[in-house]
Amino acid sequence: MRPLSKYTKPIPAGSLFGLITIYGMIPLTEQLYAFQIVIILNIATLRQSDTVYLLDSSIYIFQAWFGYPDYFHDASGRSVNAVYGYAKTLFSQLRTLNPVYLLAAFDESLFSGFRHELYPDYKANRALPDEELAHQLYLCRRLTELSGVHCVGDSVYEADDWLALGAKVAAAGGLKTAVITRDKDLAQLVRPGDLWWDWAAGKQRDYQALREHWTVLPEEIPDLLALMGDSSDNIPGIAGIGEKSSKALLQHFGNLENLYGDLDSVLGLEMRGVRRLYNALQDTEEEAFLFRELIRLHPPPQHLTLQDMSLEPVSSDRILDFFDQEGLGAAFRNLVTQHYA
C-alpha cells in the first residue's frame, strides 16, 4: 500500500473529517484505511482535550527538595537539587499526559494570605523558605513557564485556591479535571468524572473512590477536617473529636450546619461516647465554622479562561538557554535532550 502522505496535506487539529475534502485524490481501496487513521488520531486528541489538568507544582518542588540529595549545583555552587527533581517530574508529566489544557499553581502566600488574617496561627508550624530554596522555587516556576504551561500564584491566595479557579473554569466549559497533587485538601474539588491523582505514588481516585476512602463526600472534606483537625496546616479541630467520631457525625448529619443546627440529636446516635461527643461540641460552633473556612478553597476573583490554560508551543532551545543563563550544567541539558528527543 502506498503511503498516505502522498495524498494528504496539513489537516486542522481535532478535525475528525479533515481528510474528506481530499478523498477524491485517494484510490477507493485506500479510503477506508485513511479514514481509520483519522479516527484513531482524533480519538487520541479528544482523550486529552476533554480534561483540564491542574498541577499542584509546589508540592512536587518540595518533594524534590527533600527527596533528592544535595548533589546538583549551579555554576556558583548553589544547590539546585529541587530544580533537577522537579524538572524530571514536570517533563514526565508533560510527556505522559500530552495535555491540551494544563494549569500550574505555586504557593507564594505563606504567612501573607487572607487565611492568616482570619487565624494568625494558620500554618504557624511551617518556616519561610530560606534564600537558597526561594531561588530554586523561582527557577522551577520559570522552567514551567518556558515549558508552555500557564502558571498562577500570588501573595493572597494559595495554590489550592488557584486550582479551584481552574476547576471552576473547566466545569463551566463542560470539561473534566484531573488534580495532580498529594494534598488531601484538593480532593474537595473532585466531582463525578474528575480525578485526584497522586503522581508519585501512581494513585488515582475518582469521586466514588474518594468517597469510599474518606467515608464522606469529597465536597464534605472541609467539614470533616474542621472537626478532626489538620496538623499539617496547624488547624487543631474540635478538642475531643477525633477522625473516627468526625466521620461518624458527618455520615449522619452531612455538614456542620446540620450538626450544629440539631446538636441535641447527637445524644440519640447509636455509637459509643455520645455524651462525651455532645459535651465536646458545646460552644464550638464558631470555631468549627472558622476552621472550615480555612480549609475550603476560595477561587481568586481573577479572569481565567480555557484559552489561558492551553499549552503553548515550546522551544527546547529557550529552555537550554535558560539553563545556561542560570549556570545549570550537563545533567539539566540531558533532561531537555531526552524530553524533546
Describe every region a protein language model picked out.
Residues 25, 34-45:
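Short, positively charged and aromatic/hydrophobic N-terminal segments
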Residues 7, 17, 23, 33-35:
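Aromatic (phenylalanine/tyrosine) cluster motif
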Residues 7-10, 43:
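N-terminal cationic leader/targeting segments used for protein routing and processing
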Residues 43-177, 186-195, 199-203, 289-290, ...:
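Noncatalytic, basic helical substrate-engagement surface that gates or grips nucleic-acid strands
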